[in-house]
Amino acid sequence: AKVQPLVKWAAYLPPEQGTPKAGELPTLYVAVVQDTSIPGDLATDTGIALANMTLAAWAKGVGSCIMGAINKPALTRLLGIEEPQKLAFMVAFGYPAHKSSIVPLTEQTGVKYYLDENRDYCVPKRSRDEIARYL
C-alpha cells in the first residue's frame, strides 16, 4: 500500500485506463538496486536481472511490469536504500487482469502502447530482425 502511490502505471494511458483498480493490484513489488561501488556495466547487469526475474515469473503464470516511472527519492527513503546503492527500477508481480500483445512498431504507432477494443494492451516493439544480427 505504501508503494502504490509512488509508482506510475502505463504512463502513455490516462490514469483511469492504465492504473490497476482494487482487486487488480500486484501481489509483490521488487526493488531493483544497483551497487555503484562495483565496477562494470550496471545497465547490462540490471537488464539481465530484470529479464531473468520477469521470464521466470511468466513461466509460472505470473505477470510483471518493469516500472521506471517511479518516485525514486521517496522509494529510496521508504526502502532505506543508502549509498553506494541506488534504486534503478521497481518490478510489480501479480496475476494479469488484461492480456498484452506485441504489435509491430511503425511510424504510425510510434512507441506508445494502447488499449484495443477488448481493453487489452497492445505494445509496439521493433522486430527481432531490426534489433539483432545473426552469424
Task: Locate each region found by the language model.
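Acidic, surface-exposed loops and disordered segments
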Residues: 1-135
